[in-house]
Amino acid sequence: MNKGKFIVLSGPSGVGKGTIVANLLASLPIHYSISMTTRSPREGERNGVNYYFVTKDEFEKQIKQGNLLEYATYNNNYYGTPKDKIEEKLNENISVISEIEVKGAKQIKKIYPEAILIFIAPPSVEELKNRLIGRGTETIDQINERISIAEEELKVATLYDYIIVNDYLKYATDKVINIKKNS
């Protein structure tokens, strides 16, 4: 029986993962696995579309009930991948894409060794900082914390199957499309 491909995108906050995923969903027949988080929604984000936004208590309940494929904390918030739909879609030969932070991606690879892990990297840490400032959603202290986390994430990027530098959005999106088609 054929199975769909499980593609995991990771990378620092502000690198463009969400935009790449949106472009992929517009270009490919692929299912987006919506992550669950305890962080507050950013402007324009909607519950059940961008993330499932839940309280810390609700997230911890999901952990206890075994409803998450993986979970981790990032920047003092929980992030996790609900199990439902992923296996169902893969068994229907429908590929799944998920946007997961580095710790979670490692957990996914243990459960799904055939998963394709793609790390989206910024052209430079300075450019990443400029992007985060340009978003206008965080204080300078929060941005500096995200940069510190990004520097740690960049150190483990070599553990991924592919690394794509997002210095030109169309190029980065096309690279992910080609990886999906050729894997």
Q: Model-derived features: where do they sit?
A:
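Walker A/P-loop
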Residues: 18
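Post-Walker A helix-loop "phosphate-sensing" segment adjacent to the P-loop in P-loop NTPases
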Residues: 26-34
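Hydrophobic anchor at the beta1->P-loop junction of P-loop NTPases
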Residues: 9
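Conserved phosphate-donor/acceptor-positioning beta-strand/loop module used by diverse small-molecule
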Residues: 97-101, 110-134
